Amino acid sequence: MRCPFCRHDDTQVVDSRVSEDGAAIRRRRRCSACDKRFTTYERVELNLPAVVKKDGSRTEFDRRKIVASMQLALRKRPVAADAIDAAVARIEYQLLATGEREVRSEKLGELVMNELRGLDTIAYVRFASVYRRFEDVSEFADVIEEFRRASPAKTPRKR
């Protein structure tokens, strides 16, 4: 594999591990020319459905867009990168399981929101506010109230 730093063609695998979700192999590589190290991921190439946008146009499913949108919602939140990768892998699996050749962008957005809900409630609210185009504070309050009803009441701990 070509080194991303010096473009030399000769690199060696220093370490190889299966990712947490088992969907990828993480490899640490070292360039024999510049001695720098870098990480690569090996994944199965899947034939995911095309995404049909709101305007009717179609585009290829892009894992990087899903990861980027989740990372933006999770910015400065205590969620590991492996957890994001696992969530995206679950979304891909759900899309493959449908057997459909196309998926509407609205459905894809709902899948992302469901995964964020399980990862971090703040990120879920952030994503939902953009995805659902919240107009005022009451819409935030509605989502927060939805969480309160869904989760059991927590009693404050005595100190």
Swiss-Prot record:
The keyword Zinc-finger applies. Its cofactor is Zn(2+). Keywords: ATP-binding, DNA-binding, Metal-binding, Nucleotide-binding, Repressor, Transcription, Transcription regulation, Zinc, Zinc-finger. A zinc finger (unnamed) spans 3-34. The keyword Repressor applies. Binds 1 zinc ion. Pfam families: ATP-cone, Zn_ribbon_NrdR. One of its GO terms (molecular function) is DNA binding. Residues 49-139 form the ATP-cone domain. Belongs to the NrdR family. This is Transcriptional repressor NrdR.
